[in-house]
Amino acid sequence: MPTINQLVRQGREVEKIKSKSPAMENSPQRRGVCTRVYTTTPKKPNSALRKVAKVRLTNGSEVISYIGGEGHNLQEHSVVLVRGGRVKDLPGVRYHIVRGSLDLQGVKDRKQARSKYGAKKPKAK
């Protein structure tokens, strides 16, 4: 424990807050190009084939991002919008791809939580 004199001379160092999505560089979203689209398996105890894409962002960094929703139309060289937000059961996936913007279409026949999946309001019959 420091003495009062040591604190007067040096002071306390403020702990820096570490970003959870460093590749975004303090932007809300970033545009990028898909370099690889593939599926991967989650860690225990979950079991599935999660859709992910490796994306090269406009700032040059390459990140792995998650494609939410059922079905997608992404291929290599698709231009996508990436936002922060990790996927708990996929290690290394710290970003999400925004549905319904740029080359990625919204989820088809989505009725609830549509804004999260870029789905238009269905026509009332």
Curated annotation (Swiss-Prot):
GO terms for molecular function: rRNA binding; structural constituent of ribosome; tRNA binding. The modification 3-methylthioaspartic acid is found at D89. One of its GO terms (biological process) is translation. Pfam families: Ribosom_S12_S23 (PF00164). One of its GO terms (cellular component) is small ribosomal subunit. The keyword Nuclease does not apply. Residues 9-31 are annotated as: Disordered. With S4 and S5 plays an important role in translational accuracy. Interacts with and stabilizes bases of the 16S rRNA that are involved in tRNA selection in the A site and with the mRNA backbone. Located at the interface of the 30S and 50S subunits, it traverses the body of the 30S subunit contacting proteins on the other side and probably holding the rRNA structure together. The combined cluster of proteins S8, S12 and S17 appears to hold together the shoulder and platform of the 30S subunit. NCBIfam families: rpsL_bact (TIGR00981). Part of the 30S ribosomal subunit. Contacts proteins S8 and S17. May interact with IF1 in the 30S initiation complex. This is Small ribosomal subunit protein uS12. The lineage of its organism: Bacteria, Pseudomonadati, Pseudomonadota, Betaproteobacteria, Burkholderiales. The gene is rpsL.
